[in-house]
Amino acid sequence: MNCQIRKRCGSCQYIDIDYSQQLIKKKQYCQQLFPKLHVHSVEGMENPYAYRNKVIVAFNQKYEYGLYEESSHHIVPMQKCLLHDEQTHQVLSKIQSLFKRYHMSIYDEQKKRGFLKHVLIRRAVETNQTLVVLVGTDSLFKGSKNFCQELVKACPHVQSIVLNINKRQTSIVLSQQEKVLYGKGFIVDKLCGLSFKISAQSFYQINHYQCEKLYAKVAELLKAQENQIVLDTYCGIGTIGMSIAKNVKQVIGVERNRDAYKDALNNAKMNHIDNISFYNEDATAFIQKLAQSSQHIDSIIMDPPRAGSTKEFIDAVGILKPQNVVYVSCDPSTQARDLKWFQQIGYQAKDVYLYDMFPHTEHVECVSVLHRKSLEK
């Protein structure tokens, strides 16, 4: 498929490469990073398009919407992005026409004036619900009632519309201040048979289809048993921990981001999962406290941010001595570094499993399970 803005956008580094070759390139990259491990072929998508369930666009003064040009804040207008689904395009098109009709004031970065900064759209794939977030510089949105009525009438799958008030002059899209204009301020999706609330701020995997495959692999590698205690670190809104909770005695989740932590609590309650608890703390500080208290942990799941984990976190794992550690990574280079640290405390990986969460980009998700060497003898 041909992308009309690929030379200016820069988001999809591999868009001109045949998809099968993209997967080969990603595997080869990981083989260089993990020369002593068995790097499995990348789990790709049957249809590697229209997979993004989260979209952020900006508008210019002509009411054209698009993505930012690479390494700039210049908007590249687009009619369609190959990674966005048809309903997302439908919503954006209707928003565009409403902005024109209501003469929406678009924020001008150079002049530091105007109202509308961004539009964020989140889609719940399984439940067919859409959340629209308008990012503006003020809590007053004149004509918001009519705007919401017309948008929902044209796009009935829009279940909620939120105004995020961001007065900061930075590149950060969302602020903590929100005002619900329509609906409940969130949507609900289903993942791995469970329900999850998705708000503007929620961490939620962008690729729903590949996410379920990834989590199934995590459960397979964990080999959890009903008498085990599992520590789920960097747990986000609790998706991985809740997906394996039914197979174990207890899950302990830890997440530093307060919004994600609150979502995790609500999600556990919504799914009636009573053997999982969450703590709003830094993963390294939390696991160090567990190590000092001699807490028994059978298995650890870790899904750190792109920067990877910390040496202090891994040293604490060495004190806790779990049977295994399942490491999910969105950056193979930092995972490769961390696996070397794990070796120093007696944990060894044999395999790396790859998942193409972002087709047409250079990114690849990696999963490994580490076992204590002494247990393998």
Language-model features: where?
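Short strand->helix junction
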Residues: Y19, T137, F141, F203-Y204, ...
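A residue-level signal for conserved active-site and pocket-lining positions in enzyme catalytic cores
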Residues: C12, V55, V119, I161, ...
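Local cysteine-cluster metal-coordination motifs and their immediate loop/turn environment
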Residues: N2-D18, I237
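N-terminal auxiliary segments of SAM/dcSAM-dependent transferases
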Residues: S105-G183
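Rossmann-like S-adenosyl-L-methionine
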Residues: Q149-K153, H157-K377
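Short, acidic/hydrophobic/Gly-rich beta-strand patch recurrent on exposed beta strands
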Residues: G66-E70, V133-V135, A264
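Extended interfacial segments that mediate partner engagement and assembly in macromolecular machines
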Residues: Q13-D108, I121, V125-T127, L140-F141
